[in-house]
């Protein structure tokens, strides 16, 4: 029997039910439920359907004039009645995605302490490092299957937001549910409060986190280790997603734990998966292969290098050598293009640095090769921005790229919108509508010479909900590189532009449930093939995906003994 139709037996009654967002139905409680659960007189007389409630909520939502107020309003509904919240979001997913997540969630993180209203998730501070097990036991969610955790040090492109970073795990898990059908009862946002180095927060009397500099070194490593072990003891099968950790910690934590626990880093691996999926779709639309492209990155941090490594892996799978693939990828950071003779390169950057002997013939060869120099010499067909610095894809750079590439692929992926390397409008006008553009944040369609171009949002929300659903449906114990690659290929298979030769590079958000299920199947099948999940048939796997897919419908309640 469908869980959404099976009665739920509750051992409590009265106002407590109305204060529990996972089970509150508000005006939708039936006459029978109002009698049995002592709710008579606590609600208006009329019994409403969830659609009637959602219609009223949407009317109220439209009364707010700015995005932050809309975000706060939706969060209040989420903290009051989660089923209604997800029905409302699912009814207006394209309109509300930028409100519940990027770019609006960035403002919410900056104002987290000032706008704080109600608890959600867990805050685990370093001061309580010896009581992590007790804190996990205090969670209102008992059957946790997906955790998103941050330490708040690198929130979007906004830097250290301390515990204000909690807005990101809350928002990400909202997308796991609204896009991937993960029951909100199975999700838990967690913030590790290890202090902050943001002077504005340290001086802010309203700041609600630890007012001390961030811990680091062995103290930090041991604290995260204690957290991971405690989570594994409490919920041994939970999927853990690392979110918005600083570069110096993100890759080491991923390398340390990816083979120990079922975990992944969305900034590194999720971003890489959705970017590769988008590139595969663009290549398919252009009737070419990724291994034929020359790719330049602006931004050589953990996210950029993670994408680059995923691209190299895909190129190798298409038949070229790893050495050749790396010669076709050019990484540029604030000091110029990464070269093998540069000092102080991080380990994950060293593998992507160009050999100096291969580029000595370039014009303007020096120790500091600019992005424009790379475009003029390497003649890239793909340009990807993950720098967090706005406006760096200049008209000169885009036109130089277009001069040697008829249909340049340009992905300014930095979030939020204020940090984008160039707007789609500028890129398309500079290339007379010839560029294939995808962005990290949402943008309106662009009109060039009476032709309207839909702007694909190369957002991780296309990928991680499907990964989560695939892990849950298969019971996978790890998230492997092959599973992530499978998610990229599955996403590319859903591209309207690749399928029909027209439309957006990525599917419409209205189709996200179909996309997530398609990705979930590919991820789960790969997990089984690699031995990370128990064998099953395709038919049973499809059934498991549907069985795990939660929809925003009210269940009937029955009273049980206290």
UniProtKB/Swiss-Prot annotation:
It catalyses: (S)-malate + NAD(+) = pyruvate + CO2 + NADH; oxaloacetate + H(+) = pyruvate + CO2. A divalent metal cation binds at residues 243-244, 267. The active site is at 101 (proton donor), 172 (proton acceptor). Its EC number is 1.1.1.38. InterPro entries: Aminoacid_DH-like_N_sf, Malic_enzyme_CS, Malic_N_dom, Malic_N_dom_sf, Malic_NAD-bd, Malic_OxRdtase, NAD(P)-bd_dom_sf, NAD_malic_enz_proteobac. PROSITE patterns: MALIC_ENZYMES (PS00331). NAD(+) binds at residues 154, 267, 415. It comes from the Bacteria. Keywords: Metal-binding, NAD, Oxidoreductase. This is NAD-dependent malic enzyme. It comes from Shewanella pealeana (strain ATCC 700345 / ANG-SQ1).
């Amino acid at each position: 029997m469908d869980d959404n139709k099976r009665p739920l037996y509750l051992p409590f009654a009265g106002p407590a039910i109305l204060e529990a967002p996972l089970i509150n139905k508000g005006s939708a409680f039936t006459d029978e439920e109002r009698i049995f659960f002592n709710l008579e007189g606590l609600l208006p007389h009329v019994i409403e359907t969830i659609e009637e409630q959602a219609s009223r909520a949407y009317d109220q939502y439209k009364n707010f004039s700015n995005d932050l107020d809309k975000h706060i309003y939706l969060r209040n509904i989420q903290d009051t009645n989660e089923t209604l919240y997800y029905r409302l979001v699912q009814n207006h997913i394209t309109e509300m995605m930028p409100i519940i997540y990027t770019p609006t969630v960035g403002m919410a993180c900056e104002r987290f302490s000032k706008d704080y209203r109600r608890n959600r998730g867990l805050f685990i501070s370093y001061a309580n490092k010896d009581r992590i097990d007790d804190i996990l036991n205090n969670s209102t969610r008992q059957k946790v299957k997906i955790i998103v955790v941050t330490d708040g040090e690198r929130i979007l492109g906004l830097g250290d937001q301390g515990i204000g970073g909690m807005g990101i795990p809350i928002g990400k898990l909202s997308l796991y549910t609204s896009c991937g059908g993960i029951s909100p009862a199975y999700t838990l946002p967690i913030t590790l409060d290890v202090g902050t180095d943001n002077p504005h927060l340290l001086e802010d009397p309203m700041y609600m986190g630890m007012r001390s500099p961030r811990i680091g070194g062995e103290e930090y490593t041991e604290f995260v280790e204690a957290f991971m072990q405690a989570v594994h003891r409490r919920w041994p099968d939970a999927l853990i997603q690392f979110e918005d950790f600083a570069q110096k910690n993100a890759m080491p934590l991923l390398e340390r734990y990816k083979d120990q626990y079922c975990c992944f880093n969305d900034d590194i691996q999720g971003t890489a998966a959705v970017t590769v999926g988008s590139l595969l779709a663009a290549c398919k639309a252009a009737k070419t292969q990724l291994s034929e492209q020359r790719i330049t990155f602006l931004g050589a941090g953990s996210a950029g290098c993670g994408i680059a490594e995923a691209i190299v892996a895909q190129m190798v799978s298409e038949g070229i050598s790893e050495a050749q693939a790396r010669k076709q990828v050019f990484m540029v950071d604030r000091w110029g293009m990464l070269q093998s003779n540069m000092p102080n390169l991080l380990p994950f950057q060293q593998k992507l640095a160009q050999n100096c002997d291969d580029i000595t013939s370039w014009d303007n060869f020096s120790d500091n090769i600019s992005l424009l120099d790379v475009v003029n010499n390497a003649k890239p067909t793909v340009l990807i921005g993950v720098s967090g610095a706005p406006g760096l894809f200049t008209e000169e750079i885009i036109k130089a790229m277009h001069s040697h590439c008829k249909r340049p692929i340009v992905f300014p992926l930095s979030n939020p919108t204020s940090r984008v390397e160039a707007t789609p409008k500028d890129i398309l006008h500079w290339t007379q509508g010839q560029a294939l553009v995808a962005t990290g944040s949402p943008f309106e369609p662009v009109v060039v010479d009476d032709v309207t171009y839909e702007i694909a949002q190369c957002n991780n929300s296309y990928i991680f909900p499907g990964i989560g659903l695939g892990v849950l449906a298969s019971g996978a114990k790890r998230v492997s590189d092959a599973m992530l690659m499978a998610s990229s290929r599955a996403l590319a298979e859903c591209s309207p532009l690749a399928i029909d030769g027209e439309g957006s590079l990525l599917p419409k958000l209205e189709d996200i449930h179909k996309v997530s299920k398609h990705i979930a199947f590919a991820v789960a099948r790969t997990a089984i093939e690699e031995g990370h999940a128990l064998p099953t048939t395709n038919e049973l796997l499809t059934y498991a995906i549907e069985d795990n897919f939660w929809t925003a419908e009210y269940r009937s309640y029955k009273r049980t003994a206290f």
